[in-house]
């Protein structure tokens, strides 16, 4: 195998080099990113960290700011200006028809405005494979900014144009942007990162979702943009992250795995590895991908139906479906329904509640950052299983405190603690790890179809919660949280028995971990079992 590795390395023109990266790439912005390698922190013993590079940081931050940040922002941005938007709907209707809008019609229009974001997300998920096959990961993210910018302009100009339809259409287009972003960004980050930091880099998606939610809450304050005269600007600022991504990502290469396995462009793949890893000698990394490339070269991208039928990924698919369903059905969205009433019962003046609500966004962000810092130490399993388990426990506690909140003045404060604990539990694991696992469970040819399945479950579950929760809440009142507690506990139990730890494992090793449960082996393992089996058996 060593002789084989050397032959492949020479074929690619790779020779052992020193740490000097001055000749690793052409001059220009890309080289500047590579040369900032000296900013990375050192490790004991004088050894330098090889995991993080400035290019990885720029790719993750710029990618997430223009993608998952916008998803989180659009989840919360409609809350503060709700009364002003409804008034705008009524004024537009009265100007056209000569009479005020019927309350039921207004409720329907507002429900469509909120829920159509999820419909757009589903559409975006379904077109990912088609766009990604042609454009690749990076250029799909860049093209996706066209959806964000057009949606921002439509929504920001709706008041001036007197057309509420522009706001609804803009929300739909913004949903398409979110559907594409939540599929392509985790794929891109998973494929450009070394396995040692794949989880931490993947959590950037969740961190920026939380930052986006918090930013939407913050800008919605009356002192900022949450006023009747300025609410359209809440949607106009969506342009800023999109433009930042458009100006930064072009200087970075596409996923090296995509370039090598799907485009078969070895030279560009080598340069991409050099840029993202911040070193010139990437022969080992290229050889790891070539091991997959030797069998993947003749394998086309599988379809969603083929992936669902494949016995050798059956439990990976089931696990992705379970985690994504629990991600949306775990009840976090329902928490926002009770937040204002609970804060009010705790004695907080109504005018101050929007400011106190910022604490929920702050807790989300801190918990997501904590998860990103510890995920490579604790692993995926403890954070995901523990997160769902704690959510189930705190939902049960919240049900008790909400039932007894009129019996003592201090009980509502326990409810506030319960809400914050649920949010922290969600963001410390379930809020981001499902996206990471979807990227880790599948080989290159399967990954786009896997993200279509995951995204479809995600957006359909999102839509179902928005549609069904009002009826569940009306029927069960505060006991509705017991439904979410059951979902969380059930998900935790399933993951405890099925989910293997993927921390610091290659894609081949993760596939092997599922093989016994699947009772079937993927074709590449049969063809090149010496590669994968050798690595598995070599693990301590």
Curated annotation (Swiss-Prot):
Changing residue 125 to M: In RHUC2; markedly reduced urate transport activity; decreased protein expression; decreased urate uptake; no effect on glucose transport. SUPFAM superfamilies: MFS general substrate transporter (SSF103473). It comes from Homo sapiens. Glycans are attached at residue 90. One of its GO terms (molecular function) is urate transmembrane transporter activity. Changing residue 412 to R: In RHUC2; uncertain significance; according to PubMed:18701466 the variant results in decreased urate uptake, however according to PubMed:22132964 and PubMed:29967582 urate transport activity is not affected; no effect on Vmax for urate uptake; no effect on affinity for urate; no effect on protein expression; no effect on localization to plasma membrane; no effect on glucose transport. Residues 73-107, 162-171, 222-231, 338-354, 403-415, 473-478 are extracellular. The keyword Endoplasmic reticulum does not apply. It catalyses: urate(out) = urate(in). Residues 1-51, 129-140, 193-200, 253-316, 376-381, 437-451, 500-540 are cytoplasmic. Residues 1-31, 519-540 are annotated as: Disordered. Changing residue 380 to W: In RHUC2; markedly reduced urate transport activity; decreased Vmax; no effect on protein expression; no effect on glucose transport. One of its GO terms (cellular component) is basolateral plasma membrane. The gene is SLC2A9. Changing residue 25 to R: No effect on urate transport activity. This is Solute carrier family 2, facilitated glucose transporter member 9. The modification Phosphoserine is found at residues 9, 515. One of its GO terms (biological process) is hexose transmembrane transport. High-capacity urate transporter, which may play a role in the urate reabsorption by proximal tubules. May have a residual high-affinity, low-capacity glucose and fructose transporter activity. Transports urate at rates 45- to 60-fold faster than glucose. Does not transport galactose. May mediate small uptake of adenine but not of other nucleobases. It is linked to Hypouricemia renal 2: A disorder characterized by impaired uric acid reabsorption at the apical membrane of proximal renal tubule cells, and high urinary urate excretion. Patients often appear asymptomatic, but may be subject to exercise-induced acute renal failure, chronic renal dysfunction and nephrolithiasis. The chain crosses the membrane at residues 52-72, 108-128, 141-161, 172-192, 201-221, 232-252, 317-337, 355-375, 382-402, 416-436, 452-472, 479-499. Keywords: Cell membrane, Disease variant, Glycoprotein, Membrane, Phosphoprotein, Transmembrane, Transmembrane helix.
């Amino acid at each position: 195998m060593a002789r084989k590795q050397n032959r492949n390395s020479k074929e690619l023109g790779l020779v052992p080099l020193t740490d000097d990266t001055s000749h690793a790439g052409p001059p220009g912005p890309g080289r500047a990113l590579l040369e900032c390698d000296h900013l990375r922190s050192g490790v004991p013993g004088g050894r330098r960290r090889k995991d993080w590079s400035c290019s990885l940081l720029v790719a993750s931050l710029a990618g997430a700011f223009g993608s998952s940040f916008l998803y989180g922002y659009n989840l919360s941005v409609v809350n503060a200006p709700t009364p002003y938007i409804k008034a705008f709907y009524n004024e537009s209707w009265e100007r056209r028809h000569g009479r005020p809008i019927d309350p039921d019609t207004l409720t329907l229009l507002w429900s469509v405005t909120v829920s159509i974001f999820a419909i757009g997300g589903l559409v975006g998920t379904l077109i990912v494979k088609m766009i990604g096959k042609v454009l690749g990961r990076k250029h799909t993210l860049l093209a996706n900014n066209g959806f964000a910018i057009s949606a921002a302009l439509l929504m920001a100009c709706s008041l001036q144009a007197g057309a509420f339809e522009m706001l609804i259409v803009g929300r739909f287009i913004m949903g398409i942007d979110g559907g594409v972003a939540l599929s392509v960004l985790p794929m891109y980050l998973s494929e450009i990162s070394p396995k040692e930091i794949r989880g931490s880099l993947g959590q950037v998606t969740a961190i920026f979702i939380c930052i986006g939610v918090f930013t939407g809450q913050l800008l919605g304050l009356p002192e900022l943009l949450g006023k009747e005269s300025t609410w359209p600007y809440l949607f106009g600022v969506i342009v800023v992250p999109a433009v930042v991504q458009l100006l930064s990502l072009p200087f970075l290469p596409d996923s090296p795995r995509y370039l090598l396995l799907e485009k078969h462009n070895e030279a560009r793949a080598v340069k991409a590895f050099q840029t993202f890893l911040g070193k010139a000698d990437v022969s080992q990394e290229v050889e790891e991908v070539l091991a997959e490339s030797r069998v993947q070269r003749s394998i086309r991208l599988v379809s969603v139906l083929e992936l669902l039928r494949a016995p050798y990924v059956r439990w990976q698919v089931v696990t992705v479906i379970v985690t994504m369903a629990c991600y949306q059905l775990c009840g976090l969205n329902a928490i926002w329904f009770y937040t204002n009433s609970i804060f009010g019962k705790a004695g907080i003046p109504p005018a101050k509640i929007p400011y106190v609500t910022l604490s929920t966004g702050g807790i989300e962000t801190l918990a997501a950052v904590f998860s990103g810092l510890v995920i490579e130490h604790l692993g995926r399993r403890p954070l995901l299983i523990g997160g769902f388990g704690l959510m189930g426990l705190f939902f049960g506690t919240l049900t008790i405190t909400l039932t007894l909140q009129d019996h003592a003045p201090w009980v509502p404060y326990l409810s506030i603690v319960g809400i914050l604990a649920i949010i922290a539990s969600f963001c410390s694991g379930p809020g981001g790890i499902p996206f990471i696992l979807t990227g880790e469970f599948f080989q290159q040819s399967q990954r786009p179809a896997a993200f279509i399945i995951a995204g479809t479950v995600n957006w359909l579950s999102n839509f179902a919660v928005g549609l069904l929760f009002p009826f569940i809440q009306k029927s069960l009142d505060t006991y509705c949280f017991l439904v979410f507690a059951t979902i969380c506990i059930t998900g935790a139990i399933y993951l405890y028995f099925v989910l293997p730890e993927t921390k610091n494992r290659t894609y081949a090793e993760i596939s092997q971990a599922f093989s016994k449960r699947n009772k079937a082996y993927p074709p590449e393992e049969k063809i090149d079992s010496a590669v994968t089996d050798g690595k598995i058996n070599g693990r301590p």
